[in-house]
Amino acid sequence: MSFITAFGDRVFVASGDLIRTFRIGDDEGMTPLISWSELNPERIQKPSFEAEKDLKAVDKRVILCLAHSNMIAAHGRRLVAVGTNEKQIHVFEYFIDNNYKIVKAEHIVTSVVPKAPTAIVFDREDAYVVVGDRSGDVHRFSVLNGSAIEMAGAISMILDVAFSPDGKRLLMADRDEKVRAMRYPSTYVIDAYCLGHTEYVKTLAIQDNDTVWSSGGDKNLHMWSITNCSKPRRTIDLSEWDAPVRKISINVAHKKIAVLFEKKDKMIVVDLETDPAATQSVTILNESECLDVTSTGHYFIVLGRSTITVINLLTMLQATFPIDDELNAVLSATKDAVDNLFKNVTHNNQLEYEKRKAEKFEQIEQKRRRLNNQEPSTS
């Protein structure tokens, strides 16, 4: 799997077990963020889950999700978090000099998740990373000591997690066509279910405290009110592109959304200020397949199998950032953790599917009853 994210003019790329970083407009090129050999064993937390007392042994570490801290506070820390196929969450801190160059990066903490992580995000204060996993559960982990708290559960795999800008709502997208909006940190209070998709919801983009966009397998781009998800406030039909949506990313300042599709070498840019929405197709130069996209400043940045492309939203001109041979080899061979997110419920396995669903419902109800008997945390 391969991911890209950005904070200011600094961009981070994760693919395989590599984490690279560069600055837009910097001639010094791409550099590794960390070396895995530098993990501090004393900062690797022991599993606290009954079903997972041993760390998962893997032939090769693979990064499954990537996030950067928000740095809302003046004293905010520059943190990068990744989840791996070892069922671990690693948090790193990096430090910059007066020229904004990274002078040091260090391992802060490693936590253990019960199932393979699928999505990760920092909460608004950067005190916790919130992680969704393949079993449908969501946990949060302290960046100070790695301690874990279970926050929520769903029937099916969590595919994306995101926060409203004020940090008061946690949103989850899952394989069962739902977007869920919950209060944070009191996630046992569910404000709304956004029900309108007919296939899995792969990706979320937050516009403001009451607006979220979602898309995925049904090729629709829906806009929802976070506090009232009774029906989409706006829907943009993307079926003409004949592919499921892989990723959306919003540039709030320019009021545009970038949309990537599965197995395509192009993206579209949706202008949110027009109604009906105007879309512009952008073919990524010298690229065979787009893997991820992020937004920062005046740019969309697209990660492909062989390129990193910076698109200037003022001019729509493309600039390709050079990548090293090692990263290029990993990107060219990268594979998704789950090949097919479409559900395959046939007559022969319907009863088994319903049984698993009922068992999951019961687990969620038990967890909810347990949470209701606890005092809600305000930290």
From Swiss-Prot:
It holds the Pfam family WD40. Pathway: tRNA modification; N(7)-methylguanine-tRNA biosynthesis. One of its GO terms (biological process) is tRNA (guanine-N7)-methylation. WD repeats lie at residues 58-102, 112-151, 153-194, 196-234. InterPro entries: Trm82 (IPR028884), WD40/YVTN_repeat-like_dom_sf (IPR015943), WD40_rpt (IPR001680). It is found in: Nucleus. Keywords: Nucleus, Repeat, tRNA processing, WD repeat. Disulfide bonds: none annotated. GO terms for cellular component: cytosol; nucleus; tRNA methyltransferase complex. Belongs to the WD repeat TRM82 family. Required for the formation of N(7)-methylguanine at position 46 (m7G46) in tRNA. In the complex, it is required to stabilize and induce conformational changes of the catalytic subunit. Forms a heterodimer with the catalytic subunit. This is tRNA (guanine-N(7)-)-methyltransferase non-catalytic subunit.
